[in-house]
């Protein structure tokens, strides 16, 4: 629960509160997928994905409450903190099928733009950015969910 849930204290939505659970021996082997990019705590979610082997960060692009610029901002944050192998695309589409379609368009566009910036800044080469895009949009979910 978090952004968009009026009955939630957003301060309690910080994923760093999960550290005790993530460090518990009985949960270390269980994959944990942090949904909705932990918005507005994307950096913290990315940090958890970076330091815990079993934690992944889902980037949801169908949230109708966020505009393109904000989706691009949290995608940049996620790419700056989390390993590419721990990031996954999600449509977050609900109820109306068109939301999945709109999300797919926005998701590809935002991920492509953010990865393109990494190439422009010299932080990645084009083939690395293309491979990263494939991983985030498809490959990581296939591996994690054994599809």
Which residues does each predicted region cover?
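Alpha-helix capping and helix-coil boundary motifs
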Residues: 67, 94, 123-126
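Conserved, mostly hydrophobic/aromatic
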Residues: 57, 92, 141
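Short, loop-centered acidic/histidine patches that primarily coordinate divalent metals
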Residues: 60, 90-94, 112-114
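Mid-to-C-terminal alpha-helical segments outside catalytic/metal-binding sites
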Residues: 84-86, 101-147
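Catalytic pocket-lining loop regions of alpha/beta-barrel enzymes
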Residues: 1-89
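Active-site micro-motifs of SAM-dependent methyltransferase domains
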Residues: 3, 95, 143
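Short active-site-adjacent structural elements
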Residues: 96-100
């Amino acid at each position: 629960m978090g952004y968009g849930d009026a009955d939630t204290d957003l301060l309690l939505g910080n994923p760093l509160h999960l550290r005790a659970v993530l460090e518990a021996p009985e949960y270390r082997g269980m994959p944990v997928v942090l949904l909705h990019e932990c918005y507005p705590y994307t950096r913290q979610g990315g940090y958890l994905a970076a330091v815990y082997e079993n934690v992944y960060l889902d980037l949801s692009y169908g949230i109708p409450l966020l505009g393109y610029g904000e989706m691009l901002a949290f995608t940049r944050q996620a790419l700056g903190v989390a390993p590419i192998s721990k990031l996954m695309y999600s449509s977050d589409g609900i109820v109306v099928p068109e939301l999945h379609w709109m999300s797919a368009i926005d998701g590809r566009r935002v991920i492509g733009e953010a990865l393109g910036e990494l190439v422009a800044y010299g932080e990645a080469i084009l083939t690395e950015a293309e491979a990263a895009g494939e991983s985030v949009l498809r490959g990581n979910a296939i591996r994690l969910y054994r599809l």
